[in-house]
Structures are given as structure tokens and as C-alpha cells.
Amino acid sequence: MKQYLQLLEDILQNGVYKDDRTGTGTLSVFGRQLRFDLREGFPLLTTKKLHIRSIIHELLWFLSGDTNIRYLKENGVTIWDEWADEKGDLGPVYGAQWRSWRGADGRTIDQISEVIEQIKTNPNSRRLLVSAWNVAELDHMKLPPCHYAFQFYVENGTLSCMWQQRSVDTFLGLPFNIASYALLTYMVAQQCDLQPKELIFTGGDVHLYMNHIEQAKLQLTREPRPLPKLIIKRKPASIFEYRFEDFEIVDYDPHPHIKADVSV
């Protein structure tokens, strides 16, 4: 995961100060890419400990199509609390767009089901893409999608994934995003009888919040450790039937957690 640390260094050295929506301020760079070979291990950051439970439950929540944080709260996940309304609703965010995109003709589109079917039946398609950036519904979302689209690529029995992100909280958010899209790639690969190969991140406004600068510098003093492995214990009938206990991360030996505040 040295490429992640190199990105932190890049922002610290080349970032420009920008005011932002939260009032915190950022150091920002524009247009960056990271690549992870999934055959070398599961890309879970080792220079600080990540909350694996939150990563897995959030992805299962996205895939369920749910947009209320009740499920997350029941499973000890608090990462969406700051944006939900008093009933726990977030509006038509990721889960709604992935599973029930509302078209102009009134029909709903399950993008996840469709992309998996296309991978199975038309793997050379250049349309293996899911988008959460539904312009007509952005104003109804408590937080418009930061990671707004992802695309799959099939070659020689392997599956790669590239996701696009308009806004990147590099210290807190990006490590979660990397692990989440890696997990999604493993799951889709298993459902399609493929092997996971590569994960690619493409970011637009890639930034460090000003109240994360010292934490980033601390992280840069730490040496990356060997990547853990992901074990998926069973293959359910569909991607929507995975359970939390189906996943096991082994040989994860991270440096201690580094506390940092979320900018809302």
C-alpha cells in the first residue's frame, strides 16, 4: 500500500489550500490514480487499523438498496450518522441508485443485477458500468455520491474494477473506499466464476482536511506491513444474499488506529 502513502506525500507537497463546504479547509490536488493488484493480497491499509466491520456492513447495506441507517446502527456502524435525518433517512443515495435507478419513463433499473448479467453473458462489453450520479435526484440526497461510478473489465478469466470519485477525503474516506471496492470486486468475481485481478481508483478533487495534516504525517512515519487475505466462506445464489459472517480477513496486522474527526 505504498502507493497510498505516496498520495499522502503528494498532497502535502503539492496541494493547494481550498475552502470547502464543511468550513474545515483542505489541501487539494486534482486528478490522481492508484492501482492495486488484488492477486497480491486484500488492499486493507496496514499503516493504521481500519474498522473492517463498518466496511463490510456498509457494502452489504448498499447492495440491499437500503437508504435508512437503521441496519447500520443495529450492527454498530456509525459512519453515516452525521448525514441522516431524525428518522435515519438519507434520501436516494447509493443503495437507491445501484438497485432502483428511476428512469424518465417511470421504470426502475437494478444496475447491480444488470451489470452482473452482462459480465456473465457479454463479458467483452464496454458498458459494464454502474452509476450513482443521478442528476435528477441529487437535490434529494443528504450527501451526493462521492464515489459516483464504477466499471468492470473482464480478461482471460479475471475481473478488474475501476471506480471514479469526484471528492476524496484521503485520510478517512479513501482507505474505506479502497477496501469496499476490493470487496465488491471479489464478490462479483465469485458470482461470475472469475478471479479478481486489479482495482483502480481515479479521483478528482483529492484532498486532506486541514485537521488531518498531522495524522497524515504520523502515518507517513509508519512502514507498510504485508497485506492480509480475504476469505469468502461460501458462494450464495446471488450477490444480494451474502451475510457479514461470510467474510473473513486473515493475517491483518496493522499499526494502531489514528483518530481523526469527520468533516460534515
Swiss-Prot record:
<feature type="binding site">
    <location>
        <position position="169"/>
    </location>
    <ligand>
        <name>(6R)-5,10-methylene-5,6,7,8-tetrahydrofolate</name>
    </ligand>
</feature>
<comment type="subunit">
    <text>Homodimer.</text>
</comment>
<keyword id="KW-0963">Cytoplasm</keyword>
<dbReference type="InterPro" id="IPR023451">
    <property type="entry name" value="Thymidate_synth/dCMP_Mease_dom"/>
</dbReference>
<feature type="binding site" description="in other chain">
    <location>
        <position position="177"/>
    </location>
    <ligand>
        <name>dUMP</name>
    </ligand>
</feature>
<dbReference type="InterPro" id="IPR000398">
    <property type="entry name" value="Thymidylate_synthase"/>
</dbReference>
<protein>
    <recommendedName>
        <fullName>Thymidylate synthase</fullName>
        <ecNumber>2.1.1.45</ecNumber>
    </recommendedName>
</protein>
<dbReference type="GO" id="GO:0006235">
    <property type="term" value="P:dTTP biosynthetic process"/>
</dbReference>
<keyword id="KW-0808">Transferase</keyword>
<feature type="binding site">
    <location>
        <position position="51"/>
    </location>
    <ligand>
        <name>(6R)-5,10-methylene-5,6,7,8-tetrahydrofolate</name>
    </ligand>
</feature>
<feature type="binding site" description="in other chain">
    <location>
        <begin position="207"/>
        <end position="209"/>
    </location>
    <ligand>
        <name>dUMP</name>
    </ligand>
</feature>
<dbReference type="InterPro" id="IPR020940">
    <property type="entry name" value="Thymidylate_synthase_AS"/>
</dbReference>
<feature type="binding site">
    <location>
        <position position="263"/>
    </location>
    <ligand>
        <name>(6R)-5,10-methylene-5,6,7,8-tetrahydrofolate</name>
    </ligand>
</feature>
<feature type="binding site" description="in other chain">
    <location>
        <position position="21"/>
    </location>
    <ligand>
        <name>dUMP</name>
    </ligand>
</feature>
<keyword id="KW-0545">Nucleotide biosynthesis</keyword>
<dbReference type="Pfam" id="PF00303">
    <property type="entry name" value="Thymidylat_synt"/>
</dbReference>
<dbReference type="GO" id="GO:0006231">
    <property type="term" value="P:dTMP biosynthetic process"/>
</dbReference>
<keyword id="KW-0489">Methyltransferase</keyword>
<dbReference type="InterPro" id="IPR036926">
    <property type="entry name" value="Thymidate_synth/dCMP_Mease_sf"/>
</dbReference>
<feature type="binding site" description="in other chain">
    <location>
        <begin position="166"/>
        <end position="169"/>
    </location>
    <ligand>
        <name>dUMP</name>
    </ligand>
</feature>
<dbReference type="GO" id="GO:0005829">
    <property type="term" value="C:cytosol"/>
</dbReference>
<comment type="function">
    <text>Catalyzes the reductive methylation of 2'-deoxyuridine-5'-monophosphate (dUMP) to 2'-deoxythymidine-5'-monophosphate (dTMP) while utilizing 5,10-methylenetetrahydrofolate (mTHF) as the methyl donor and reductant in the reaction, yielding dihydrofolate (DHF) as a by-product. This enzymatic reaction provides an intracellular de novo source of dTMP, an essential precursor for DNA biosynthesis.</text>
</comment>
<dbReference type="GO" id="GO:0004799">
    <property type="term" value="F:thymidylate synthase activity"/>
</dbReference>
<feature type="binding site">
    <location>
        <begin position="126"/>
        <end position="127"/>
    </location>
    <ligand>
        <name>dUMP</name>
    </ligand>
</feature>
<comment type="similarity">
    <text>Belongs to the thymidylate synthase family. Bacterial-type ThyA subfamily.</text>
</comment>
<feature type="active site" description="Nucleophile">
    <location>
        <position position="146"/>
    </location>
</feature>
<dbReference type="InterPro" id="IPR045097">
    <property type="entry name" value="Thymidate_synth/dCMP_Mease"/>
</dbReference>
<comment type="pathway">
    <text>Pyrimidine metabolism; dTTP biosynthesis.</text>
</comment>
<dbReference type="GO" id="GO:0032259">
    <property type="term" value="P:methylation"/>
</dbReference>
